[in-house]
Structures are given as C-alpha cells and as structure tokens.
C-alpha cells in the first residue's frame, strides 16, 4: 500500500517522494529483472474524518507543510464516489462476541479526506527482487537467512555488524530496513532515544 498520510512530517515527506519513484519504477531500478517488474497502480485513498483521528485536521496540516495534495469530501461526495460506504457511526470498536457488535451507535460520519497520490504495488515481493537485481548490478552482495546479532561501534560511531554465525562485516554505514522489527535493530545500535516514533510487529 502506498500512501502519503503519516503521523510525522518527515514520514509524509519520505512517502510523497516515494510515490514519484513508484510511478517510474522500472526507470528507477535501471536494470531488467528476469521475473518481470513490479507495477504501481495509483488509485487514490480515502480516510474518514472521525473523532478518533481528530477529524484528520492534524494530518492535513502536516500535508500542507510539504505541499502534498488532499481534497475535502463531505457526506454527499462520499456517497457519489463510493456509494457502497455505510456512513452510520459504529464507534467505539467492539469485540466480535459483544452483543452490540455491528450495531450503529447514532449519528453519521461527517466527511472524509481524499488523497490523490496513493495506491498499491501489484507484487511487493517482486518489487524487492527488482531492488535485489539493481543492487547486484551495481556490485552489491546479499546474504540471506543471516541474522544480525550485534552492531559494532567505535567511538560512538558504527563500525560494522556481527552475524549469528560470528561473521563480522566492517562498514561505516548500516541502513535499517527491518520493517516492523526495526526497533530491535535500533536497540542494537543504541539509537532508540533518537526516534520520534516506535515500531513493532503488531496485529490490528
């Protein structure tokens, strides 16, 4: 899923830059992948204005700082564009075994925000393989199933990583792309306190 609305200005800016990369993905990768190339489909994205997200006001303020486009939709516009939406309110969230689960609680959604620069990549796994091909074409190397257990530092700066099998790789730069588990890598590097947000694998 590609979207531009996040909880920090930096996150929004990085995501917005990424949209333009995805639009020209094959050119960005610069090499042919025998498995084919991932394709980005720009569909736009809608988020409902509700009390739980402060009616998206803080979100839109962040987007305005960067210049990321968004469009305010009232209930009539939502019904026009997405007639299958049920705009009745069901909050607060309830468990499936709650007798009132799925029952409206009164009132209706007041509006939404449409983000035109959003969509999805048809095959995320293929996209990562595209990146692998580009890295290998540039002389890079991959080690799969090689767990990092330590990030070595000298005088407060990164000096390399240690793998589970004891292999040491010297480097002055470590890029953390561990996704939901990135906080574990940040902890190894001792930089958790520098992070504005925390990450973790979770089920929602």
Enumerate the predicted regions with their spans:
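Local beta-strand N-terminus motif with an aromatic residue
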Residues: 30, 158, 171-172
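Short beta-strand to alpha-helix junction loop
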Residues: 13-14, 47-55, 114-136, 143
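A conserved short coil-to-beta-strand element within the FAD-binding core of flavoproteins
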Residues: 141-159
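Flavin (primarily FAD) cofactor-binding/catalytic cores of flavoenzymes
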Residues: 126, 133, 146-148, 161-166
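Dinucleotide-binding Rossmann-like beta1-alpha1 core, especially the glycine-rich loop
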Residues: 1-99
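Central helical "cap/lid" subdomain
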Residues: 165-204
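General beta-strand structural signal in soluble alpha/beta enzymes
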Residues: 71-74, 143-144, 176
């Amino acid at each position: 899923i590609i979207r531009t609305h996040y909880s920090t200005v930096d996150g929004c800016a990085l995501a917005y830059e990424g949209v333009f990369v995805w639009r020209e993905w094959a050119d960005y990768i610069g090499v042919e992948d025998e498995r084919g190339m991932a394709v980005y489909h720009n569909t736009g994205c809608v988020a409902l204005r509700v009390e739980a997200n402060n009616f998206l006001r803080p979100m839109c303020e962040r987007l305005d700082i960067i210049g990321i486009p968004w469009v305010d939709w009232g209930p009539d516009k939502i019904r026009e564009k997405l007639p299958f939406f049920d705009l009745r309110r069901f909050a607060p969230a309830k468990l499936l075994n709650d007798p009132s689960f799925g029952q409206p609680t009164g009132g209706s959604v007041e509006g939404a925000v449409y983000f035109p620069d959003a969509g999805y990549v048809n095959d995320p796994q293929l996209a990562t393989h595209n990146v692998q091909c580009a890295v290998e074409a540039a002389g890079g190397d991959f080690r799969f199933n090689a767990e990092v257990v330590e990030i070595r530092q000298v005088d407060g700066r990164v000096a390399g990583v240690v793998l589970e099998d004891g292999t040491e790789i010297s480097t002055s730069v470590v890029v953390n792309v561990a996704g939901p588990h990135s906080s574990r890598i940040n902890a190894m590097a001792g930089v958790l306190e520098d992070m504005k947000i925390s990450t973790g694998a979770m089920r929602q």
